[in-house]
Amino acid sequence: MKKVVLAFSGGLDTSFCVKYLKDDKGMEVHSVLVDTGGFTDEEVADIEKKAYDLGVKTHYTARVADKYYKDCIRFLIFGNVLKNNTYPLSVSAERIFQAVAVAEYAKSIGATAIAHGSTGAGNDQVRFDMAFRIIVPDAEIITPIRDLKLSREAEIEYLKGKGVQREWHKSTYSINQGLWGTSVGGKETLNSWDYLPEEAYPTQLTKKKPSEITLEFIKGELKAVNNRRFKNPVEAIRRVHALAAPYAIGRDTHVGDTIIGIKGRVGFEAPAPLIIIKSHHLLEKHVLTKWQQYWKQNLAEWYGMLLHEGHFNEPVLRDIEAYFEHSQNTVTGTVRVRLAPYNFQVLGIQSDYDLMSDVFGSYGEMNNAWSGDDVRGFSKIASNQVMIHQKIQELAEKKK
């Protein structure tokens, strides 16, 4: 009997896959849930029960939140990565780690086939296929939902015919909650004009009085929130979320180019990622040189694009990560942030590495490290080439 590992979430599509692979294809199904930090213990237990009720041979939960942070999220912070200057790659980064974990599990148990429940309409199918082909290249990739092109109603009828009686209620909005943000999809995101209403977002406004928090970074990593230290950065991220989410902070709509070549739109709420990235970015403005910031921003654009499009295993990402890590040697300090309903403001920083030091001068006020003559000479040299260019153009025009 062929052994197949299935990426399993407990939803309609992956539940269909279990019965289809087991009953129709005669395969031994081993389901895998990958928890990147977005599930509660109760949800994990419920998904495991659903898997066994459907008839899987074994079910495995891969807990990869710490690995997800260490191998991905911290580099998204180091690079201040926001896709199209908006989206913190909440789902795209998570999906890649889910795909990698499923593939690694399939390899560990010697499975000859590997399956996922993605449709043929989005990015996830590519991310899963790529990870599977790279990590378990000899395994057959099976994609029942994509290949059979079944409607939701057809899947429900199939499962009913197999004796699976569950309430397959389709929510008005598709919610994907994760450690690095939550995506929100609905009819409004299927066109270019409408916007998600208040009730679409899973976190509602419950706090209205503004407050201030502090975030302490050491070599680019968040280590303390409001002077409370965290050994595990994942818990620090969750703490920022707990403080900011009641203000309904971090909502936006991402518009981008999908891997399959069409434009796509998705809403999201990501209070912790946006606050952490913007705070980290302000600290970097104070402690990095102009050219460090310039080149890091350029590399971050490429890093985010490659990661979003499923190229996590591309070696150049390791090269960019090495640059990011080296750039964080002086990114140490405390950032002050104001929280208010629907918005936040990064107020200021304190750092021993702050290059905005009054020892050398205050912008527009006083110079302590140079004289007027120094500036006069510098300005002459700095403008020399363009002055020569201008003169040559004038002489050439006179010869006409």
Can you annotate each of these PLM segments?
Residues 1-400:
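Nucleotide-activated chemistry modules centered on ATP-dependent adenylation/adenylyltransferase
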